[in-house]
Amino acid sequence: MTHVEVVATIAPQLSIEETLIQKINHRIDAIDVLELRIDQIENVTVDQVAEMITKLKVMQDSFKLLVTYRTKLQGGYGQFINDLYLNLISDLANINGIDMIDIEWQADIDIEKHQRIITHLQQYNKEVVISHHNFESTPPLDELQFIFFKMQKFNPEYVKLAVMPHNKNDVLNLLQAMSTFSDTMDCKVVGISMSKLGLISRTAQGVFGGALTYGCIGEPQAPGQIDVTDLKAQVTLY
């Protein structure tokens, strides 16, 4: 069984309000990584992100900071695509205080360009979470394994695969794919079966070799997320 870090996802609008800071502080013992979603901010700029990071850095000794721009293609709000998206991800490397950066994977990406950006982020001491999300369904087991395989070829620190289950076999397939690859990959693996049906993938992440599990602070930011306080309590049961 692997050690699991609990990620708390927040999605503020333009600024970090005092009420949000209070909510974070109230759950500080349950948070290992704070994920700052920025795709909900229309035409977000690096300067806006840097300003938010500055406010969060006051508490940063308590957790690592992960920045994520989730595109509409993968279930987020972000309108940036192609070079606009990749340029933003690349520019995040210049912000002090960011520990981890999410970058999306699709089957049709420009492999060389993606690899250059991932290497660039790592040169600035940012851990890379390469991720793929399917909010519609769970692909067959062999396809799940293939996605993990393709993502790990970029040599990131983490590979993350989140899919939507429609039955218990979908959940089992995701857990099996994660378990198999956690034994063979050099990088850390994250597998999430979304919605209430897949909740066990969040709470028993470490049993199946996963390294990160995602929860929320109040309002869920993805299907199946539960509050990080409850998530931390359940993760530690395993």
UniProtKB/Swiss-Prot annotation:
Transmembrane segments: none annotated. One of its GO terms (molecular function) is 3-dehydroquinate dehydratase activity. Its EC number is 4.2.1.10. PANTHER family: 3-DEHYDROQUINATE DEHYDRATASE. SUPFAM superfamilies: Aldolase. It comes from Staphylococcus aureus (strain MSSA476). It catalyses: 3-dehydroquinate = 3-dehydroshikimate + H2O. Pfam families: DHquinase_I. Involved in the third step of the chorismate pathway, which leads to the biosynthesis of aromatic amino acids. Catalyzes the cis-dehydration of 3-dehydroquinate (DHQ) and introduces the first double bond of the aromatic ring to yield 3-dehydroshikimate. This is 3-dehydroquinate dehydratase. 3-dehydroquinate binds at E35, L36, R37, R70, R202, Q225. The lineage of its organism: Bacteria, Bacillati, Bacillota, Bacilli, Bacillales.
